[in-house]
Amino acid sequence: MALDFSNATVKAWRRENGRVGVRNHVLILPVDDISNAACEAVANNVKGTLAIPHAYGRLQFGEDLELHFRTIIGTGANPNVAAVVVIGIEPEWTQVIVDGIAKTGKPVTGFSIEQKGDFETIRQAGWKAKEYVHWASELQKEDCPISDLWISTKCGESDTTTGLSSCPTVGNMYDKLLPQGIYGCFGETSEITGAEHICEKRAANPETARKFKEIWQAYSDDVIFAHQTDDLSDSQPTKGNILGGLTTIEEKALGNLEKIGRTSTYIDAMGPAETPSKGPGLYFMDSSSAAAECVTLMAAGGYVIHTFPTGQGNVVGNPIVPVIKISGNPRTLRTMSEHIDVDVTGVLTREMTIDQAGDALIEMIIRTANGRMTAAEALGHREFSMTKLYRSA
């Protein structure tokens, strides 16, 4: 019999805009790649802060620049972040990031290196970071309904066990928690190839179906038809997928869609790093299938917990969002157990039902929201990877 989570609560931080965060980070956030060193210096000096270095932010333009801003602003705005120190080389773009994060109501201050240099920027930013750490450390958790959580998903290192156990486990979780009012998110546009017609039918309404089809068709036009091939050179499926028994992208796509459950429909199709705007429910996000990129985009969209089914074992984490790993592969549980949070191997040995596996995942989500570190957090995996649409000027 399935457990009843209808009255479940978590201990979490209620932010200024009403959202709920399950972590309490003070970020030192670079606007651009050449501000990484200053951010890391501040984080090294002030205990309790976290720098997120990245590779981009200079000479970008058009939609690529918009996505860059959206990702950086969304990362700082995520409810798992209590306060933000922003550092950029130039004041104008730094202020764009500060203004975007400030809309949440959380404390945020920006510093530009230009005409000050590293030493003075690090000194000023360090004082502000210390002030924020003192403030954030006194914030108190409160009881919040589980419906306040925003939970995203993406799978990685998939094999034949993924579509049979760990992906349906996530789908079962969504079928149980979405009716309670959570926000959910799935994506991986390339990994829906071959099952796009099925995904289109799972849309809640014709407008959402149309938006999804446009997103998928744009990917198809840009990649498959532009290069006149459906051979993605061992990228989709990967060598690991093939060794694990998934020989075609269609097989992989069918397993991918198991993550959205049996009864759930998605209410909107969003661009990368966009924030849901149509209320509680399941959303599709146009995103890369690369693990670090996808989790980064969904975290920037505001999701506070990420569920990650894996067959052969994936080690990815994220700086601000706990990533919960689920696996049903007995060999992976023997060889990579340090990376797995939820063991659903019993599904394949018929010692556990999908319903029981879904309950186990929900229990782990609650424990994680209450403060349990995920395997990725405990092992220091903080992968942050920006999605770039085209080359810089």
UniProtKB/Swiss-Prot annotation:
Cystine pairings recorded for this chain: none
Which keywords fit this entry according to its UniProt record?
Answer: Cytoplasm, Lyase
Gene field: suyB
BP GO annotations: D-galacturonate catabolic process
- The keyword ATP-binding appears for this protein: no
Q: Which organism's genome codes for this protein?
A: Paracoccus pantotrophus
Assembly and interaction partners: (2R)-sulfolactate sulfo-lyase is composed of a SuyA and a SuyB subunit.
Annotated function = Together with SuyA, desulfonates sulfolactate to pyruvate and sulfite.
Kindly provide the name given to this protein in its UniProt entry. (2R)-sulfolactate sulfo-lyase subunit beta
Q: What is its EC number?
A: 4.4.1.24
Instruction: Provide the primary localization.
Output: cytoplasm
Instruction: Show the catalytic activity.
Output: (2R)-3-sulfolactate = sulfite + pyruvate + H(+)
Where does it reside? Answer: Cytoplasm
